[in-house]
Amino acid sequence: TPGLTITGPCEMMVFEGLPGSAFDCWKDILRPDQRLTKACELLRRFVPWEAELCQKVKLTDEQATLQGSYTPVVKKPTFRLSYGKPVLGLGDSILLNDPIGGQGANNACQSATFFLNKIKEHESRLFTEEWMQETFETYWKQSAQWATKWTNLMLKPSKSFVSLLRAASHQPNTANWLANGFDIPRKILTEMDLNE
């Protein structure tokens, strides 16, 4: 992935690992140079054709690496401010999916649009905590649950989904259809037949 750092343009690598997998190895690797060494080892082991492209890779600076973990969660969508008024959260403040599914910005945009439309429909009535909870539940059923299912499918792909990914690697129409599924996971998931 192309990037820009304080020292200029660069190419970035992202490694994600399920707990207990070979890629779940970063917790005790603290120094950036050690992280780069481990990244190159993983490339050589799992994707040697990519490792060939990284033979001369080097860090741009001492802050060139970032490590962390991510716990997907659906939070309570409402919160009470210190003076008692309820507020409705949206996007990552209430719904966290693993980044592998590419749904963070998608959920933020879709929830903002959905909630705005519901606010307009509600007109001048009170925006109670109950209304906010119901609005979120409707959003979950119509949109957000599909983003979560899509992300979970990426994390633990079925054999059928792996076959679909393989097909997309050499069939442009399938690749385009699959890539467009990131925008509207509900549409693509209802179109896919991934029965094992």
What are these language model-derived features?
Residues W26-D28, I100-G104:
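Short, solvent-exposed loop/turn segments at secondary-structure boundaries
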Residues Q67-L95, P99:
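FAD-binding beta-loop-beta segment adjacent to the flavin cofactor pocket
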Residues T1-G68:
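Conserved FAD/dinucleotide-binding core of flavoprotein oxidoreductases
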Residues T60-A64, R80, G101-Q103, L116-E196:
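C-terminal helical "tail/cap" subdomain of flavin- and related membrane-associated enzymes
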